[in-house]
């Protein structure tokens, strides 16, 4: 998280303290490109028994790529490990336990994926979106297409990830690290992946954002108002960038989204 924060603030691999932090993280990397899961005593009940979680590698990789290490051969190895865990439908699973994919809680569902986890998929997509070349890869575009199917407009979550980056929100959780659906972050991903407001889902998110702008031109982060100027800068940048994007094709049909759909009973 420290490298993510420093990278967001504009520090890169030219700084000695960034180099030292990055080398320490790389020193913990496994031969296959991944990073180990925490010890069992650090896992919550929901995570015990898991053998692999994409987010275990996405979190350290994101800090590295935000500081300019995206094309480092060690980072590229981590990307290859993440791509190898990609599901056929373009999402990433929550985990593998005893050779089987883990179940998906409703708050982490993806509308058009059976085993895809929105938190894990968002984490990996964020890593791809900050990479100078992989950000417009088919894997990134497909993942964003799936995430856009989460049709939720939650005002209370708007700005959460920015507030976490600047230290106002706690950095906790593994499976839930990217579980909050923050439209501000989604728009940030959209322009980085070069999506377009011609997609009706993105257009609706943009309209929602504009409707929440305050009387003085600012977007307030409700939980911590001191993050307001940071959130405002981020949203203005995303809105400006999205106005120039046109080359985007969605492959997903638009369907109503429900976190916990009603199950059809047999009897």
What do these predicted regions represent?
Residues 209-226:
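Conserved blade-ending motifs and adjacent loop-strand segments that build the rim/top face
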Residues 32, 89, 216:
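Acidic carboxylate motifs that coordinate Ca2+ or other divalent cations, activating on Asp/Glu
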Residues 29-35:
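Short acidic, low-complexity segments enriched in Ser/Thr/Gly/Pro
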Residues 8-10, 25-28:
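Acidic catalytic motifs of isoprenoid enzymes
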Residues 1-20, 36-77, 87-142, 146-204, ...:
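An alpha-helical repeat/solenoid feature that recognizes helix-turn-helix modules
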Residues 21-26, 82, 143, 147, ...:
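Buried hydrophobic core positions in alpha-solenoid tandem helical repeats
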